[in-house]
Every structure is written in C-alpha cells, then in structure tokens.
Amino acid sequence: MAHDASAPRRFVKIAILTVSDTRSLDTDTSGSFLQQALEEEGHHLADRKLVIDDIYQMRAVVSTWIADPEVEVIITTGGTGFTGRDSTPEALSPLFDKHIEGFGELFRQLSYDEIGTSTVQSRCLAGLSNNTAIFCVPGSTGACKTAWNGIIRQQLDSTFQPCNFVQHVRRKSQ
C-alpha cells in the first residue's frame, strides 16, 4: 500500500444517500460523518439526500445520479441489514454494470474486529454503473467510519497504488 507522490491528485464529486425510516437530514449522523470526511480529503459534495427504505425511491435517486455528469461516486448509508424493510442491495444491485465483490468481503473482515460475528449480517456492497462508483454501507455511524477509513478513503485517493477507483470513474461530460 503505497502512494505515488508524482501522480497528480484528482478529487471527485460524491453524492450521499441516506436510507432511513427514522432519520432526517438534521439527525443523520452517518451522512454527516461521510460528508465531513469526504470534504476533509478535498473531494466535493455533489448532492445529499435522504429517502425512506423503499426500493423505488432509492432507485429513482441513484439512477438520476448515475446519469448526472456532476456525480462520479455515490455512497449510500443504511438499508443493508436483515430487518424486513432493509432493501438497499435489492434496490441497487440491478443497477450495477459490474459488481465489486471485494468491497463487501473486506468490509466484513474489518468489521469483524469491531463487532465480531455480527458482521455476517451486513449486506454491504459496491459496484460500477456508467463510470460511477457506488458504495452501499450500513447505516450506523461506526460502520460508515469503518468503510470510509478502512476502504473508501484510500480507493478514492488517485495517488494510492497499485490501483484505486478514481481511475475507473470518468467525468461523464468528457
């Protein structure tokens, strides 16, 4: 895990979607953490929304962002568990052109050190769609911190070697 100091640093435009039946944007600590973290790294917040745990509302928002040339990365938080209404994987997986299986695998490995075997109930996932990277993480602020600090931050750093996702997301207007 090295950084190429000679590589130009490119910052990306990121949209955040919180999926919750109980939060508002004012009480959404997970989305607020992600926004602060991405801005501290120099990335730009393209948009931020909150929807209830409804497959069609999630698809509508994410599909709009996938088509938007101003959105290069999407991070969703919430809806990845096993309760009756958790439906982020069912809503968003069909939108992926390519699945990034290693994301969920690595998240659960990192999460195991924090919450033990409860990590098997995480259905977090990631994929690429129309040159947009999409990361779907659990709704707890702790899980968002694990995903950001352990995986997403480095993968959105264009100087991170041997590879990163910045090289896979392209400005759609080009």
What are these regions (language model features)?
Residues 1-174:
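Non-catalytic beta/alpha edge segments that cap or flank active sites
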